[in-house]
Amino acid sequence: MRSKLMLILTASVAVMLSHPSTQTILAQGQAALTGTVNSDAEGKMEGVVVTASKPGSIVEVSVTTDAQGRYSFPESRLDPGEYAISIRAVGYDIDSPAKATVAPEATTTADIRLKKTKNLASQLTNAEWMMSIPGTEEQKAELLNCVGCHTLERIARSTHDSDEWTQVVARMMGYGAVSQPIKPQPMLDRARAGTPEQYRKFADYLATINLSSTDHWQYELKTLPRPKGRDTRAIVTEYDMVRPTTEPHDILVDKEGHVWYTDFGEMFIGKFDPKTLKLTEYPIKKFKDKAPTGLLSIEFDHAGKIWFDTMYQGSLGRLDPKTGEISYYPLAPEYNDDRVQLNFTGLHHEVDGKVWTKSVGTQDIFRLDLASNKWEKFHPTDGLPSARRHTIYQVMADSKNNLWMAEFTQGHLGKIDAKTRQVTWYPIPTAHARARRMQIDTEDRVLVTEYRASKVALFDTKTEKFTEYTLPPYTFPYRANFDKNGELWASTMHTDRVVRLDPKTGNTVQYLMPSDTNMRTVFVDNSTTPVTFWVGSNHDHRIVKLEPLD
């Protein structure tokens, strides 16, 4: 697991308090802490992420060095006090450790010196491992399923041979998607693990990229370039949710500025106030004592109520943000067996009084009539061609409460007509796209990420045509959304970078996060100028706020 490097300032590092007029002044106000980052290899270094954190605080603030190697924290972001400073720059370590003291109405200068690292492997992102390891695109595509629970570094550092890998993969496939290295959770449906020998081909490949037959990797470790230009113009604030097993998955921000999230690792919905740093957790009922715990999706309905799934617990839920009251809607007993894994909701029930969801274990779609509490079952993948088993990732409802489905195995977008029950499938232009998460706008256009293809597709439901947007290689986007200016924002579990794309030009900005950030759902707050981007750090129990400076 990669970690940030902590510094303690020594006499060899320049630290001083100076009159404000001699310091760099940002557009956000006077700098509280500033300095340059240098190395013998490069001199002044652009694209180094510098993080300031107070001991005992749950808040860390980060900025990135510009073309002159300078970083600067606005006074409004750092209260007076002592701060530990950490950095992120792939290929480099700190030459001298350090900390800095911020004083009222003055600017502290702390220059930082870096040296070449002797342990590059510990700094690589999942994307950089994908760049480095040998293999065909088809072979590497299997690894895209691994990063939901752990890094690819764990695979590369392992010593399992092919026979051992067949057992390991079968064991992993028997764990729920909510599992994490410190908390594996076996599913009730043991059949989903498969048999070890069915993973032989993948096991053979894994044994060629790890340390099973050698004491060092037989391939070059490759890295992504550091941020440059607009990539460096952002302030990132991370909020630690404290519990190690907490995994903020889906994120929403309400009109009062509270951040709501589902806990992918525990049975809680969280409400966090970034102003007061108060965290309120709403315990969610367990329906199956031995089933995996954790929640995935969270959405507001038309009345401002929060709907969520309980995954392996087999129920939907609705939380009233005003009262804290929670209502539950368990799946009907005739459908609610050990295979059930309810993910996502289709929420325009103001149209016809019905709510949609789907089960991963059976690939069934369910629709609940809220008035009668009766459930309907659909199996829409029956109409898809192919010998392979198709899987639906997300479901989401449009304004007429028609259900849209992102088909993950190959890459289709599907629709169930709410009135006629007719199923229609639309193949995404790029083959093997792996359609993943969606957003539906006010015009009922469907935005869907192409996980394997590193693209995002916009489907016009009136013309029934796709427009595809290409993201940087190895992005493998999880979810995306447009902001009020028409720009596209995407999250990833691979590069530790938030991607911002201008659809008119195709130009992208990539904001590097301060630490290992496995991102899931994105939330773009259009009430600010520039907009504010929110996401959960799913494997690091944090909520992340990114504020672009332009």
What is the predicted role of each segment?
Residues T36-M45, L78:
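Structural motif
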Residues P55-I58, P80-K99:
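A short, solvent-exposed loop/turn motif at the edges and junctions
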Residues P55-S72:
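Short, acidic Ser/Thr/Gly-rich low-complexity loop/linker segments typical of extracellular
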Residues T101-L124:
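Extracellular beta-sheet/turn segments enriched in Thr/Pro/Gly and aliphatic residues
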Residues E142-E153, F202, L206:
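The canonical Cys-X-X-Cys-His
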Residues P244-E256, K288-A303, Y335-D352, L384-K400, ...:
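Beta-rich, blade/repeat-based domains predominating
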Residues V259-G265, I306-Y312, V355-G361, L403-T409, ...:
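Conserved beta-strand positions in repeat-built beta-propeller and related beta-rich domains
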Residues M513-D550:
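Blade-level signature of beta-propeller repeat domains, shared across WD40, Kelch, NHL, RCC1
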